[in-house]
Curated annotation (Swiss-Prot):
The gene is atg12. Forms a conjugate with apg-4/atg5. The keyword RNA-binding does not apply. Residues 1-13 have a biased composition (Polar residues). This is Ubiquitin-like protein atg12. It comes from Neurospora crassa (strain ATCC 24698 / 74-OR23-1A / CBS 708.71 / DSM 1257 / FGSC 987).
Length: 157
């Protein structure tokens, strides 16, 4: 049994043309018989949400804060890299990883032309602008230390 009515969701595009409007000569395709999809709106595009929900406001307020003001970093030499006298140091959570690299270069007395490669948990080399507190929060070990391996030649990753 063929029906002359199109099934819901299978309507073909038809052109809408307004004879009274001279500017409507270029008609745009319109899908008739289709409901508009329920697309999620961002909070900034929503006309219903005038303010953020309390949970979102609290989460955003705490996003840049850290549980500890300073975090412990444990340095581990890899390969022929010299060992440090103090393998653990405390660094402010808000500092960038560049601060850790500068400290290690200064402590090892590395020339400006020489390279030092740093890896978190012997897996990846973080970007210099990465925040130490974020690295610690995501990759600390069971003793609440961030393990940073260092080498004079590329080792991991």
């Amino acid at each position: 049994m063929a029906s002359s009515q199109p099934l819901h969701g299978t309507a073909s595009p038809s052109l809408v043309h307004d004879d009274n409007n001279p500017n409507s000569s270029t008609a745009s395709p319109v899908l008739e018989g289709r409901d508009s999809p329920n697309l999620p709106l961002t909070m900034t595009a929503s006309t219903v949400l005038m303010t953020l929900p309390r949970d979102a406001t609290a989460a955003l307020a705490e996003a840049g804060t850290f549980d500890q003001e300073k975090v412990v970093i444990r340095f581990k030499p890899v390969g022929s890299a010299p060992a440090l006298r103090r393998e653990q140091v405390k660094v402010l959570s808000t500092h960038s990883f560049e601060t850790v690299v500068a400290y290690l270069r200064k402590t090892l007395k590395v020339q400006e032309t020489d390279s030092v490669f740093l890896y978190v948990n012997s897996v990846f080399a973080p970007a210099l602008d990465e925040v130490v507190g974020n690295l610690w929060r995501c990759f600390k070990d069971s003793t609440n230390q961030l393990n940073v391996s260092y080498s004079m030649t590329p080792s991991f990753g």
